[in-house]
Regions:
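A conserved structural/catalytic subdomain of Rossmann-like adenosyl-cofactor enzymes
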Residues: 2-4, 8, 298-520
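Non-catalytic, mostly N-terminal accessory regions of nucleic-acid modification and defense proteins
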Residues: 1-213, 217-218, 222, 280-292, ...
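Conserved, well-folded catalytic cores of nucleic-acid-processing
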Residues: 23, 165, 169, 188, ...
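Conserved S-adenosyl-L-methionine
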Residues: 200-306, 311-313, 317-322, 327-332, ...
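A structure-centric signal for secondary-structure junctions around beta-strands
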Residues: 37, 182, 225, 252, ...
Length: 520
């Protein structure tokens, strides 16, 4: 049953924060301005997070009136080392969001103040185990950018509005609010920015309904997993869905990912913090996954979910080292230079645990194209790694209307069959896009879990059948589309035609008689 109070609270919050965010940008494009709004939200969150943590510790120690926000910086310094070990970062009381905001309107050097505060937050983690999680986190928050204004005074005026606007967002108390307010607000804003940005937005954000489907497919029969990985993690929302589906603490060893775009990489790390993921429970790297993969030495991943970029160019056979790379070598051939899709599949397979599942959104062309891509499909099928192929509806993603597919990979299959599901009609139309409803998702996941066959919806293909079809993995090859044409009863139709002809003859005879009478 849906918690009405929680839903109302969420909708009210969403309306309010989008109004604030939209107002704040002024004449600046929302997509360009997102780093300021989201970065300010993060600054507020970690300020309130560390203050709440310290205050609670003092209350528990019998000091109920203590407020870290009012503490002199010199005294607070004594706790720096311990707090960095426990929280991963440190903020002086004078540099907390609430205190900087209180003086912002009268601070003629607000841009410099914020630049210093952000540098201090990043530097506080240097030399500690959390250094990688904080390094460069505020790089996209350029306080001297012309996007904020042509002069320092104009820029500071915009920064004051930013601080006040984010302060006005009803995000409640870090501990007491009914919903995961900061993380919720952050994801909502990213959804709005992505939908308004079109194609560029779709490159960093996977819609929540698709994220839910991928994660549920990857966790069928599991109550917990060791960790989750996304080789093209974007803003990280798909990674975080594992905890929402399985429950808090069900992802034992955390969240791992790689992202090539530095702005999106920073958004992803911020997203982790805003969802209260501890600094030692996530590891996001900013590198090219295909040519410079991270997490080589990590324990393999029990869950891999991803929506990698469709048919992008990559080094391929131009790089002589890649054909001997242990990720790609088993297939004996590399994905084409102009289409990296199957390179992401092979990479994911290499990183997958023996008891794990990978659910990856794919461009449909990789299911049927020939040459190198056919050879890679042959390798995947012959070695029994492909568990299921799902045809999705068109228009599910921001910035593209193509109908994508999901490929589900497993290393520990109990049969050598491939399940094909035609879910192309499992959606509802919402404004300009299609959306998967909970009912749509349940139907797909239930069919997948039971490996059930249903006419015009799913087919469990034998290995030999896939072989006979030259390793074509298009769902339409295996699941016959429902014939929606009206069935015609020929006997009934002929009788109706005979009646019409007879009636026509009667009318014609009557008309002839009338004409004869008039002429006579």
């Amino acid at each position: 049953m849906v918690d009405t109070k929680k839903e109302q609270e969420r909708e009210e919050l969403h309306r309010a924060i989008w109004a604030i965010a939209d107002d704040l940008r002024g004449a600046v494009d929302g997509w360009d301005f997102k780093s300021y709004v989201l970065g300010t939200m993060f600054y507020r969150y970690i300020s309130e997070n560390i203050a709440s943590y310290i205050n609670q510790g003092e209350i528990d120690a019998g000091n109920p009136d203590f407020r870290y926000e009012d503490m002199p910086d010199a005294e607070a310094e004594q706790a720096r080392e311990g707090l960095v070990q426990e929280k991963g970062f440190f903020i002086l009381p004078s540099e907390l969001f609430c205190n900087v905001r209180a003086k912002a309107a009268s601070d003629e050097n607000l841009n410099e103040t914020l630049e210093t505060v952000f540098r201090h937050i990043e530097e506080s983690a240097k030399g500690s185990s959390s250094e990688g999680q904080f390094a460069g986190l505020f790089d996209d928050y350029d306080v001297n950018s012309n996007k904020l204004g042509a002069t320092v005074a104009k820029r500071n005026e915009k920064l004051v509005k930013l601080l006040n606007g984010v302060a006005d967002m009803n995000l409640g108390d870090v501990k007491e609010h009914d919903i995961d307010a900061f993380g919720d607000a952050y994801e909502y804003l990213m959804t709005m920015y992505a939908s308004n940005a079109g194609k560029s937005g779709g490159e960093f954000f996977t819609p929540a309904d698709v994220s839910e489907l991928l994660t549920r497919l990857g966790t069928v029969g599991k109550k917990e997993i060791n960790k989750v990985y996304d080789p093209a993690c974007g803003s990280g929302s798909l990674l975080l869905k594992a905890e929402k589906v399985l429950g808090r603490d069900a992802v034992r060893n955390g969240f791992f990912g790689q992202e090539i775009n530095i702005t999106t990489y920073n958004l992803c790390r911020i997203n982790m913090f805003l969802h209260d993921v501890e600094f030692d429970k996530f590891d996001i790297a900013c590198e090219d996954t295909l040519t410079n993969p991270q997490h080589w030495d990590d324990e393999p991943f029990e869950l891999i979910v991803s929506n990698p970029p469709y048919s992008i160019k990559w080094a391929g056979d131009e790089n002589p080292l890649l054909i001997n790379d242990p990720r790609f070598a088993p297939a004996g051939v590399l994905a084409p230079k102009s289409k990296a899709d199957l390179a992401f599949i092979m990479h994911s397979l290499a990183w997958l645990a023996s008891n794990g599942t990978a659910a990856i959104v794919c461009f449909p062309g990789i299911m049927y194209r020939g040459s190198a891509e056919q050879k890679i499909r042959k390798y995947l099928v012959d070695n029994n790694f492909i568990d299921c192929i799902i045809q999705l509806p068109s228009n599910l993603f921001f910035g593209t209307s193509i109908a994508t597919c999901i490929m589900v990979l497993k290393k520990g299959k109990t049969d050598n069959k491939v399940l094909f599901i035609d879910a192309s009609s499992e959606c509802v139309k919402v404004t300009n896009n299609n959306k998967l409803t909970p009912e749509n998702i349940n139907k797909i996941v239930d069919t997948f879990a039971q490996r059930a066959e249903e006419a015009h919806f799913s087919h469990l293909a034998e290995y030999s059948e896939v072989q006979e079809n030259d390793y074509n993995l298009s769902v339409s090859t295996y699941v016959e589309a429902k014939d929606t044409r009206e069935k015609i009863d020929i006997v009934k139709l002929n009788a109706e035609i005979a009646q019409i002809v007879a009636r026509e003859n009667e009318l014609r005879a009557a008309i002839d008689q009338i004409v004869a009478e008039i002429e006579g």
